[in-house]
Swiss-Prot record:
The gene is ETR1. NADP(+) binds at residues 157, 185-188, 208-210, 283-286, 308-310, 373. Induction: Positively regulated by the zinc-responsive transcriptional regulator ZAP1. It comes from Saccharomyces cerevisiae (strain ATCC 204508 / S288c) (Baker's yeast). The active site is at 73 (proton donor). Catalyzes the NADPH-dependent reduction of trans-2-enoyl thioesters in mitochondrial fatty acid synthesis (fatty acid synthesis type II). Fatty acid chain elongation in mitochondria uses acyl carrier protein (ACP) as an acyl group carrier, but the enzyme accepts both ACP and CoA thioesters as substrates in vitro. Required for respiration and the maintenance of the mitochondrial compartment. It is an enzyme of class 1 (oxidoreductase). Belongs to the zinc-containing alcohol dehydrogenase family. Quinone oxidoreductase subfamily. InterPro entries: GroES-like_sf, Mito_Enoyl-ACP_Reductase, NAD(P)-bd_dom_sf. It is found in: Mitochondrion matrix. It catalyses: a 2,3-saturated acyl-[ACP] + NADP(+) = a (2E)-enoyl-[ACP] + NADPH + H(+); (2E,4E)-hexadienoyl-CoA + NADPH + H(+) = (4E)-hexenoyl-CoA + NADP(+); (2E)-hexenoyl-CoA + NADPH + H(+) = hexanoyl-CoA + NADP(+). One of its GO terms (molecular function) is enoyl-[acyl-carrier-protein] reductase (NADPH) activity. Keywords: DNA-binding, Fatty acid biosynthesis, Fatty acid metabolism, Lipid biosynthesis, Lipid metabolism, Mitochondrion, NADP, Oxidoreductase, Phosphoprotein, Transit peptide. This is Enoyl-[acyl-carrier-protein] reductase, mitochondrial.
Amino acid sequence: MLPTFKRYMSSSAHQIPKHFKSLIYSTHEVEDCTKVLSVKNYTPKQDLSQSIVLKTLAFPINPSDINQLQGVYPSRPEKTYDYSTDEPAAIAGNEGVFEVVSLPSGSSKGDLKLGDRVIPLQANQGTWSNYRVFSSSSDLIKVNDLDLFSAATVSVNGCTGFQLVSDYIDWNSNGNEWIIQNAGTSSVSKIVTQVAKAKGIKTLSVIRDRDNFDEVAKVLEDKYGATKVISESQNNDKTFAKEVLSKILGENARVRLALNSVGGKSSASIARKLENNALMLTYGGMSKQPVTLPTSLHIFKGLTSKGYWVTEKNKKNPQSKIDTISDFIKMYNYGHIISPRDEIETLTWNTNTTTDEQLLELVKKGITGKGKKKMVVLEW
């Protein structure tokens, strides 16, 4: 397990600047969303002596962040004139981890202490910034026990994976009960397999066919706790389903939950493997193909298919996110969930030496880059 954060012990450990620096946008562009981003230096309008001031430690660049810049994401922040702009603007980013560097004297600070590591309770707070300001501790969740990479990604991938496993099925951990999921190499799927294993639930993860299939499958099973990994060609093969699948699942197996983030043919194939009156949750659509399910699954097998959106779920019930983070941290501390560090490429923002132009190019690289998930880590 990676070492957790160390806490500053005095308020003199950090000097709050008069000017903040944020990556902002006023317009949207679908074809090249990097064009709408700019770096803005501004004086915060809040009274910092009466506010909770946070310095940013790291923020990931998520697909939802990019979709907001494109203007196609259903949830987006309100644009304001708070950043000394000619047009209303918003700070980009929905997720990140921060350190408390200044607290007000009143009750609004709650149980926060200088040096606490926190994440925002809700999305649309604007995380691509060197500092952020909050008015109440009730808008923040402490994550002191998590390493940097887990803390910076727990709001989206962590919550999604944990809630998909925990919030919809009343599991019998002593039974032979299964989850089937596609996109088995995704960050969310890796959380799912780890959480499920800790709860005594078995997982069948489907991944794309590839030359190094056995190598990837072994990592997913040995490192991330998947019970069994199969390929999409096996997932779509009716003979495999009839002759091989039952041997994998074992006696009295119950495939009770399907998790779909691909759509298209893959979603129908995982749905076919569910028991009667089971549930399929769709939380993504990587193939950009619609979810098409056979009529027979609904009529004769009583399939329920519904969507899951972590932003809306936690907006409607903020306590569910607080509880999820608490349970996630417990599993992390027990060693049931490992850090996603190996899956992340870090981009360094040195707050003393990185110029505005370099910062903008850094984030643009994170948006357009391929391969591993990109995370901007601030050096102070």
